[in-house]
Amino acid sequence: MFQNNYNNNTNYNNNNFKLNDGNQIPSIGLGTYYSENPGEVGDAINNALKNGYRHIDGAAFYGNEKVIGNSLKEIFKEGEIKREDIFYTSKLWNSCHNSNLVVKHCVKTIEDLGIGYLDLYLIHWPIAFENSNPLGLTIEPLRDQNGNPIIAPVSIRETWQEMEKLVELGLVKSIGVSNFNVQNLVDLLTYAKIKPVVNQVEIHPYLTQFKLQEYCDKYEIKLVAYSPLGQGKCDFFSNKILKSIAGKYKKSVANVIFKWLNQRGIAAIPKSGNHSRIIENFNIFDFQLSNDDIEKINSLNANIRTCSPITFFGTPFYLFD
């Protein structure tokens, strides 16, 4: 069993982590994946930015970049927070991997957001879909008779070369990947002229990802944790170990989880539309978990995934299993 090297003595009690290209990423951000109420994401961003957040995580697939752009426009208009104060991440969807589509869709994202450039742009998944429009003017994939996306013969290498062009063009500051396993990364690093700065994956106490982190640390690829609370599908808030640790520090279970990630050097991007919870989630910089408590959380690993590409795409894409 892999033993992590992160402990109470490691100085990860700060707001930012340095990336391998010299840029910095805020260690906790706001996720924007879906909202039943279109206005919710705008309100959440406004609330988050006014309460200390400077990291917003989005994606073209989420379908809300124009709404987010309108919200940011109003926030910037107030004058207290400027574009350069914010670290914005977006992602290239699977149906836009072709070399003639990458720049086009990055530009569309930037225009929808109205922010001039992206701080970080990720390949959302290491799988390409056929685009339903010959000109690639949509992210909607071409589907088979069962409604499942049709896989496109596009290599990650082809897509990554276009991602590198985005940096050269000044459209993005940093580039990275999401949902990549070690084999994907090994291959990518054989030809990448610009090394990915980030690999955004699902990480939480029931899916600790230590082996993946060991590899990423070796090549200075920072992990970012999506679904750090398990999308509400995990019983973290009733877990006796997590509740006991939270009580010890007089913090919430969520705070303990985010702090555990922080002390491992992993950025977290929890999603919430609740005003008080957004504020509470950010409140992790005034305490430090002991080595013993970190090991207790580490012991909870059960390799439970709440976001599986097999069920997500209806395609036999065994990325992790």
UniProtKB/Swiss-Prot annotation:
Chain positions recorded as NADP(+) binding sites: 22-31, 227-281
Source domain of life is Eukaryota
The record lists substrate as bound by H124
Q: Give EC number(s), comma-separated.
A: 1.1.1.21
The protein's GO terms of the molecular function aspect are: aldose reductase (NADPH) activity; glyceraldehyde oxidoreductase activity
| Pfam families for this protein | Aldo_ket_red
Top-tier EC class = oxidoreductase
Q: Where is the active site?
A: Y62 (proton donor)
Q: Which UniProt keywords apply?
A: NADP, Oxidoreductase
Write out the catalysed reaction: an alditol + NAD(+) = an aldose + NADH + H(+); an alditol + NADP(+) = an aldose + NADPH + H(+)
Does the keyword NADP feature in the UniProt annotation? yes
* GO CC terms of this entry: cytosol
GO BP annotations of the record are: carbohydrate derivative metabolic process
Per the entry, what this protein does is: Catalyzes the NADPH-dependent reduction of a wide variety of carbonyl-containing compounds to their corresponding alcohols with a broad range of catalytic efficiencies.
Q: Which family does it belong to?
A: Belongs to the aldo/keto reductase family.
User: Can you say what this protein is called?
Assistant: Aldose reductase C
Species whose genome carries this gene = Dictyostelium discoideum (Social amoeba)
Task: Tell me the lineage of the source organism.
Answer: Eukaryota, Amoebozoa, Evosea, Eumycetozoa, Dictyostelia
- Gene label: alrC
